[in-house]
């Protein structure tokens, strides 16, 4: 999926490929996917604090990267909102829980999809061609490889 986002990003003017991967409380799936693919510019995970706006924020970093390379690829774990430094930037305003008692997060991928484009237009007058990919259920439907099977057996 990251390769698809990369292909979409490089084939568009000011292209941005945004991929949301599983990872509510841990970003190891997003991290490992980024490490195995050399085309990712930014990886957002719940464990590492980050800002969206401001001079050191994600939005400015994306603009800078697009200005340099003409494209950018971002991978975000679904629970990355937990890493936001500024509580006012949180997208989940009301705490909700599912039947099992797990927190329900608002969709950070959809949120970023809209906000990055708006930010680039309003602050830099830069139109961005953003392609958003959410392969969550496709990942669950694939048979595990040998390493995953061994790890699961050890954890069990």
Where are these regions (language model features)?
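Accessory alpha-helical/coil subdomains and C-terminal extensions
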Residues: 1-128
């Amino acid at each position: 999926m990251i390769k698809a986002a990369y292909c979409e990003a490089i084939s568009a003017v000011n292209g941005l490929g945004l991929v949301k991967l599983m990872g509510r409380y841990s970003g190891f799936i997003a991290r490992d996917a980024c490490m195995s693919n050399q085309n990712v510019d930014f990886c957002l995970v719940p464990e590492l604090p980050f800002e969206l706006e401001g001079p050191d924020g994600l939005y400015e970093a994306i603009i800078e990267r697009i200005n340099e390379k003409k494209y950018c690829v971002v991978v975000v774990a679904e629970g990355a909102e937990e890493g936001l430094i500024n509580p006012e930037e949180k997208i989940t305003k009301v705490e909700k829980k599912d039947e099992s008692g797990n927190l329900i997060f608002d969709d950070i991928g959809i949120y970023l999809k809209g906000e990055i484009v708006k930010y680039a237009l309003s602050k830099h007058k830069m139109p961005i061609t953003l392609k958003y990919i959410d392969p969550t259920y496709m990942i669950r439907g694939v048979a595990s490889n040998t390493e995953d099977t061994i790890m699961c057996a050890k954890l069990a």
